UniProtKB/Swiss-Prot annotation:
It holds the Pfam family SPASM. Its cofactor is [4Fe-4S] cluster. This is PqqA peptide cyclase. It comes from Azotobacter vinelandii (strain DJ / ATCC BAA-1303). It is an enzyme of class 1 (oxidoreductase). Keywords: 4Fe-4S, Iron, Iron-sulfur, Metal-binding, Oxidoreductase, PQQ biosynthesis, S-adenosyl-L-methionine. One of its GO terms (molecular function) is 4 iron, 4 sulfur cluster binding. [4Fe-4S] cluster binds at C25, C29, C32. Residues 11-226 form the Radical SAM core domain. The gene is pqqE. It catalyses: [PQQ precursor protein] + S-adenosyl-L-methionine = E-Y cross-linked-[PQQ precursor protein] + 5'-deoxyadenosine + L-methionine + H(+). Binds 1 [4Fe-4S] cluster. The cluster is coordinated with 3 cysteines and an exchangeable S-adenosyl-L-methionine.
Amino acid sequence: MSAPGSSCTEPGPPLWLLAELTYRCPLQCPYCSNPLDFARHGAELSTAEWIEVFRQARELGAAQLGFSGGEPLVRQDLSELIGAARGLGYYTNLITSGIGLSEARIAEFATAGLDHIQVSFQAADAELNDLLAGSGKAFARKLAMARAVKAQGYPMVLNFVTHRHNIDAIERIIELCLELEADYIELATCQFYGWAELNRAGLLPTRAQLERAERITNQWREKLAAQGHPCKLIFVTPDYYEERPKACMGGWASLFLDIAPDGTALPCHNARMLPVQFPNVREHSLRHIWYDSFGFNRFRGDDWLPEPCRSCDEKGRDFGGCRCQAFLLTGDAEATDPVCAKSAHHGLILDARRQAEEAPLGLERLVHRNARTSEIICRSRSE
């Protein structure tokens, strides 16, 4: 089934499955991609329910399984879930803050069959890291766990979400990652969804900051290549400084399948913000969800595209851009992504750039992600 969204051919399998095991998290990062109203979402899937999700997704062709959150380490059944995924033949990776990790759990995960670990940091110094995380001593714990991950022999990605308050320390960030023997360094400039969108005025870097950071990253790439160093640097820019939108997730429901903690199935991490009814694995099979559900077919292909996207010769590359970003900025999920210079709403992006230059919010005004604030947001929306 391809309707209602498009005339596209039958979609391929969901190759990448992301299991958002929980929205619970010990940290309070102001750029978290979790929904603002996470406090209102229902009970988490049980161990047995998650394993059934893994089984069904594997039958559909999923090959890679990421364990995410929130903080997936708060799930006491994580080792069991890893073992079940390994038994089904997945390549598995754990995406974690490192808080709640221990040498014993790292060894336990290795025994269960975990393939890969990504550890996130907030900054390259303890004071800023812990301020952004909303947790004292988080930095010291992260350092210890990154070293323990390497000692266990895992391939390790160190991830830094960069923004206006830490991006100027990009060189120190890279140096720290090399000291910790990272195999990959992901320098991911903040993407503005969830809590990051709420705090955009305090997080969006200036163009000059981004250009400097990218220049330094490229210099380090050249230096490491000349040394024959195996570490790879990945630099992700925000599309707020582009004139064409990103091809979000490689196209709506084309290869990525996200399962939220309560079992809601989504074509991307942020799609539950949209005015679209998405199915739940407690009520439908993954085969039905992926191939036949309204939500997953809503923006597949290109029949749904408005002008100027419909007649644009670039629509096969960007698919009209990000539906979540279009909705966040315009209130219309079908609108052309305002990042695109051809969009009638591109002025919203230009305004955001100007604000980053002229009137950014200070670090002290960032709203931290936590259950109490989420509950306040939920109440305000219901009034």
